[in-house]
Amino acid sequence: DSIGRESNVYTTTVRTDTYKLPTISVTTSATENSITVRVNATPGDGNIVSYHYSRDDGSNYTSSPNNSYTFDGLTSGTTYYLKVYVTDSNGRTSTVATRTQATTYVNPSVSRVTASNITSDSVTINVTASGGSNSISRYYYSSNNGSTWVNSTSSSYTFTNLSPETTYNFKVYVTDTAGHSSTQKGVSATTNEPTLAELCSGKTFANCIKENVYTSDGVNDLYLHDGVGTYRSLEAGDNSYRFSGANPNNYVCFGSTVATCPSDNLYRIIGVFGNQVKLIKYDYASISVLGSHYDGITIPNAEYYKGDLSYIPCYYWSGSSSNDNNTDVNTWSESQLNTVNLNTNYLNNIGSTWSSKIATTRWKVGGNTYDNLYRDATVQTSYQYEIKSPAESTTYNAKIGLMYLSDYGYATSPENWNEYMMHLNYVINNNWMYMGVDEWTITRRSGTPSGFAFYITQDGSVDFFGVKYRKTGIRPTFYLNSDVELESGTGSASDPYRLVV
């Protein structure tokens, strides 16, 4: 009291109420570049008014009235340390919930693998791929099902030095700039059979035919006339390689480099003689290449003609444009067909690029008698008396000539080589050289009466006529230079052999 006296002590016990804080539970989910935090909060004595989110272990918080929050713009494949708490209406906070969450990482992926540009010894592999979280840095390629790998920064790779006609199991995967890899994806491809051009690389065209087109008599309709084998008694015996039969793949595109060979530039291989390939024009020559000195045209008889020309210019063997001006001299050196049409006009009109590929040849133009080359002559007999033992030893050096009678005879199938030349019309379906229009050969008839040369009739037989009286279609014939090489082609009419220009 006022004078300093104290009362006695009164003791009692009092208990205050406990304050209930809010409580939380937290779940998280992630994508490549974001993390979403979801909070399930239970209020205590106050209402929940705000949520607080941190992605950097509590260094910085973002407040929100919402119970979920998404952190965007994150780095893929990265671990983030999350903290979350809530505040109630009385300013009281929950305990801090801690979570660890990593953003997802999208690996690079390969969606497509294809094989292209397949040859006999190479295959190109093409890859379609996406980078995922990072860009692609390298492509890995295997040709042996993943045993060994090569790598490149390019999405295509060409395997070379492969074996022909072999199936390869190719595998591919990619890596990104962070070193992450895709899964492997594969494709199988079989290398081609070697093309003739590949097999003949570095060889002359003549050697290519002898060593790669010819394998044995009859294969590819090609026969070696070496006096050996089934037809040895009927062969020429000159070691030539000759195409025989109905329609061998012996086409050559000569005089043009366009993708589809014009029909006027199609030639066919008679054979290989020594180191030279001998060609004959597939169809009859036009005025544009042979020029003047023709005497009218002929409309081919559709019953016989095998070509596509609407009309064919006709030339006398002696060469003038009118038989009134012709001589009946059947000497090839004096023929204007030879000197003007073939060895001047034709050579000039095909151009120097192509004429320079034609060899100057010693043509055997001595000829022989009616009996030796026609009436009593088989194909071999005709060859003997036309080439080996002509009536005269006359030769003529020039680039362009016409077919020999024996060329025509040996173009028929070998089972017909014992036919008489006068009966070759019976086997025209087995003779690729037959075209169905009268045409001159280079071979003169010797003896009397004079002034005659042999020709192939429209029905496929052999006959003779006066050089100043009959006019026929002309198919230039020549030997290629020995150094000419093959560039491409299979020898078919649609894919003829192409020569290196």
Please name every model-derived segment.
Residues 1-5, 71-92, 159-180:
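Beta-strand-rich modules
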Residues 67-69, 155-157:
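Short strand-edge motifs at loop-to-beta-strand transitions and within beta-strands
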